[in-house]
Amino acid sequence: MFDIGVNLTSTQFAKDRDKVIKRAREAGVSGMLITGTNALESQQALSLARQHPDYCWSTAGVHPHHASEWSGETAATLRRLAESPQMVAIGECGLDFNRNFSDPEQQAYAFNAQLALAAELSLPVFLHCREAHERFISILKPWLPKLKAAVLHCFTGTRPELESCLAEGLFIGITGWICDERRGQELRELMPLIPADRLLLETDAPWLLPRDMRPRPPSRRNEPCFLPHIVQQVALLRGDDAGELAAQTALNARRLFNL
């Protein structure tokens, strides 16, 4: 199994990153993608990936929350990071109209700029969309023929939104959100609709600790070593064998990111 979304640059991991990676290996996680969400964190993510070249890779991008920070200097930084074989995708980029930490037009501008950069560099894109589906698809769609591949990370949308994303050829990233009986019920019902060769799994650690985990870690911090729990839950919802699902989703990740 492969974790496509780990926020390993988070200060929550500052004291024990090596142990976090060790626990993930021991849990059977075969690799992980470290997410970059702004220029600085993208540099930090690549630095961490280089310390574990057989196990960790990174993305480089500007999350919609940080879209107001986008500049020519940011683009130059991401282009430089892309020279490393450990940096395998542009993102996390997209739109988030849930909280609008950057205004929608700033978000759209930064999203377009990163799609252009991904097309220029022939890299996949690692996408974010929350409460912005129609605008998200309208911006993304013209770029798709020019992009190597695209994954919508941490999908939490509706059935029509899922069908729209699949129709456009997107890969779908699923997190422990499906383990939340309060928020994840609709998402749980959508699991059988995702083609096996388009499904990717992720923890989004340290966020989104699976709500149904027992026992819960005292820290309430999510970790990549909990990915097997998500695998089990997704397999159950799809009627799949957990081992086969773990292998298939890991293969999907390695193909998508050319690992």
From Swiss-Prot:
Gene3D superfamilies: Metal-dependent hydrolases
GO CC term (a single one): cytoplasm
Binding site for a divalent metal cation: 92, 128, 153
Names of required cofactors: Mg(2+)
GO molecular function: 3'-5'-RNA exonuclease activity; magnesium ion binding; single-stranded DNA 3'-5' DNA exonuclease activity
Compartment(s): Cytoplasm
Protein name: 3'-5' ssDNA/RNA exonuclease TatD
Native species: Erwinia tasmaniensis (strain DSM 17950 / CFBP 7177 / CIP 109463 / NCPPB 4357 / Et1/99)
